[in-house]
A protein has these predicted regions:
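Substrate-binding/catalytic subdomain of NAD(P)-dependent oxidoreductase enzymes
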Residues: 2-102
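Short hinge/gating elements
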Residues: 13-16, 113-119
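Conserved phosphate/anionic-ligand binding catalytic regions in large, soluble enzymes, centered on
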Residues: 23-26, 121-130
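Short acidic-glycine loop/turn motifs at beta-strand connectors
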Residues: 77-80, 107-111
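Active-site lining segments that contact anionic ligands and/or coordinate catalytic metals
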Residues: 82, 100-102, 112, 162-166
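Low-complexity, glycine/alanine/valine/leucine- and proline-rich hydrophobic stretches
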Residues: 89-110, 118-126, 173-182
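Helix-enriched interaction subdomains in cytosolic or periplasmic regions
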Residues: 114, 118, 125-126, 134-140
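A conserved regulatory-domain signal marking ACT and ACT-like small-molecule sensing domains
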Residues: 130, 135-198
């Protein structure tokens, strides 16, 4: 709780941190980005999402001992059978800047490009600037940048996304061999059912 209070004090977490620690805010941003990029109509509930609320001091110690820090990571990718999309805590090298957010895009013709900026914007200037810009656009009668697309089925398929996962169960920590994201979420549900505090 002390870490969360510290994050709120510096603007890294909202006053009500639920959207931050349960990864709901990153998932909303992922939905908007994926819908714009792929011309689909994903809903928040379609996307598997796992936050950081169950990460313990023991986990953080384990990460540091291995030279890692944990950050929320979102990914959306067009696949032949729909869209691969998920939100998960991810381990990065300890040198990764803790309070920076990064967004990377890849297009067939444009290649890879990205943006990086301070992540301490919970209710501060970047948010206020965006809200003000939206209000001015509405007042000026500008055509909205984001158009709601007529709903049509779009399958979330994470079966080809192979990652290694960190699990803590029965007081033991382990890293899996590469498994698909869907399988990892199934394992998470099973662990939480057997060990509600895991």
């Amino acid at each position: 709780m002390a870490a969360l209070k510290g994050a709120q004090d510096i603007g890294f977490a909202e006053k009500d941190p639920t959207d931050d620690v349960e990864a709901l805010d990153p998932r909303r941003k992922l939905v908007l980005s994926a819908n714009l990029a792929f011309g689909v109509s994903l809903r928040e509930d379609d996307i598997p999402c796992f936050g950081i609320s169950t990460i313990s001091a023991e986990d953080i110690t384990f990460f540091r001992e291995h030279g890692w820090i944990c950050k929320l990571f979102t990914r959306a990718k067009k696949v032949s059978s729909g869209v691969s999309a998920f939100v998960i805590p991810t381990l990065f090298g300890i040198t990764a800047p803790e309070i920076y957010s990064n967004v990377a895009f890849y297009g067939e013709r444009i290649g890879k490009f990205g943006f990086s900026g301070a992540g301490t914007s919970a209710g501060v200037y970047p948010t206020g600037s965006s809200v003000l810009a939206d209000c001015l656009d509405i007042q000026a009668g500008c055509d909205p940048f984001y158009h709601v697309i007529a709903p049509h089925p779009c399958l979330i398929n994470n079966s080809n996304e192979m990652k290694r996962f960190y699990f803590r169960t029965q007081g033991k920590q382990f890293i899996t061999e590469p498994i698909c994201v869907g399988e990892a979420f199934d394992q998470i549900r099973q662990i939480q059912k057997a060990e509600p505090r895991a």
